Every structure is written in C-alpha cells, then in structure tokens.
Design a protein with these regions (language model features):
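Detector for C-terminal structural segments
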Residues: 1, 37-46, 67-179
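Append "and occasionally in soluble cytosolic enzymes with long acidic Gly/Pro-rich linkers
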Residues: 1-47, 138
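Structural recognition of the beta-strand scaffold that forms the well-ordered cores
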Residues: 27-30, 57-60, 77-81, 150-151
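Short strand-loop junctions, especially beta-strand C-caps/beta-turns
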Residues: 30-34, 61, 126
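Short alpha-helix C-terminal cap/hinge motif
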Residues: 45-56
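Short helix-initiation/N-cap motifs at beta->coil->alpha
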Residues: 58-68
Length: 179
C-alpha cells in the first residue's frame, strides 16, 4: 500500500500524514456507536492506516443518526452488512438503487451507476436463470473493480438457551426463529 501511495504522489509529511498538492490524506469513517464490533474494527483500521500515513478519523454515532448520515452520503467510508441467506444477493442489490442505505450514496460517483441500476432491475424481473447469472456477474464485477465494497469480516450469530429445551434450532438467518 505504501508503494502505491508513493507512486500516486502521496508524500509523507513531517506529521507522518501523507499529502499531495497541499492536501492531507484524511478519511472519515462513520460507524454505529451502538455496535461494539464496528467500534473495535474502526479503531484497528485507524491504527493500521496511521502506519502507512493515512489519517483515519473515526466517528461513532447512535444508530438513527448513523443511518441518516448513511442515507445522505455524509461519509468517506462506512460499515455495511448484507442480509444473508435467503435474502441475498437480490435484497442487498435491490436496496442499492434508492437512497435508503449507504450503498446508493457510495455508488453515486460511478460512471456506470445507471447501467448498474438497470442491470439490478433486470435481475429482479428476469425469469431466465442464465441471464440473471450474467447480470449478477456484471454488477458484482463492476462493484469489485471500483472497490466500492471491501469485505472485512463475517459476523456469526450466537444464541444461548437451556440444555433441556429440545427440538430447537436456528435457520440460516438471524431474522427468523422457528418455534
């Protein structure tokens, strides 16, 4: 990462923060302060970015403020999760087309945002599985190439219940508990 920043003209200043054309390399990371996990990851990233000369300013906000700022695009970087099985990939992709989550704002700078949105719409209405697969490949490849999303972790759900409770199990999603 350091050599890539060097090649791009970002020089380490006296304060150990890189700068280019008089501009410091500062990035704001927004996280949900109600999430212990997000705070820990934000602090870790801040420490790691500092080692390569990037000032990562972390901002924890209570959940509603966090969500409002995500929708408005008031962030440089933000945490995001997908919904998982059985909702994805279609649910996460569908949500990218409207300003309801940070995805929409994060993608606004993409040259082919309209084409990506149309491909997502086509995925949702097509019954041709090969066409859908081709469209998924297009969308996910474009988002990967532009590094819009950087996978960091996968959080497992945990549950505690009494050992004498029989016939109880969890589904693949945290949103359903069969009774």
């Amino acid at each position: 990462a350091q050599s890539m920043l060097d090649e791009a003209g970002w020089v380490v200043g006296a304060d150990k923060i890189r700068e280019k054309d008089g501009q410091k390399l500062n990035i704001d990371l927004l996280y949900n302060s109600d999430s212990v996990t997000e705070k820990a990851i934000a602090e870790y990233l801040q420490s790691e970015y500092q080692k390569i000369g990037i000032s990562l300013n972390i901002h924890g906000e209570e959940e509603q403020s966090y969500r409002d700022n995500m929708k408005a695009g008031n962030f440089d970087m933000v945490f995001n999760i997908c919904w998982g099985t059985p909702y994805d990939p279609q649910s996460s992709l569908a949500a990218m087309r409207a300003p309801v989550y940070g995805d929409y704002a994060a993608q606004l700078g993409l040259e082919d945002k309209a084409e990506i949105d149309q491909a997502i719409t086509d995925i949702l209405v097509s019954t041709d599985e090969q066409k859908r697969q081709d469209l998924y490949t297009f969308v996910l490849t474009r988002l990967h190439e532009d590094a819009v999303y950087i996978p960091l972790t996968y959080e497992c759900n945990k549950a505690i219940y009494r050992s004498d409770l029989k016939g109880f199990h969890f589904t693949q999603t945290q949103y359903e508990v069969p009774l």
